[in-house]
Amino acid sequence: MLGWTLMFLVVAIIAGLFGFTGIAGAAAGIAKIIFFLFIVLLVISLLVNALKGKAPRA
């Protein structure tokens, strides 16, 4: 859990730097691409788990 906390802290700091320095427009375009990429990966992961017959871990 500490690892996740540190990762989210770093992400929050980077997001704050982007927001306060005015380069948020470029970062937003990249974020949209990454968002849809991870949505596709999520769907693929769910399909693979469904085909294997395993329940997803909580």
From Swiss-Prot:
The keyword Transmembrane helix applies. The chain crosses the membrane at residues 6-26, 28-48. Pfam families: DUF1328. GO terms for cellular component: plasma membrane. Keywords: Cell membrane, Membrane, Transmembrane, Transmembrane helix. It is a multi-pass membrane protein. InterPro entries: DUF1328 (IPR009760). HAMAP family: UPF0391. Belongs to the UPF0391 family. This is UPF0391 membrane protein Shewmr4_2671. It comes from Shewanella sp. (strain MR-4).
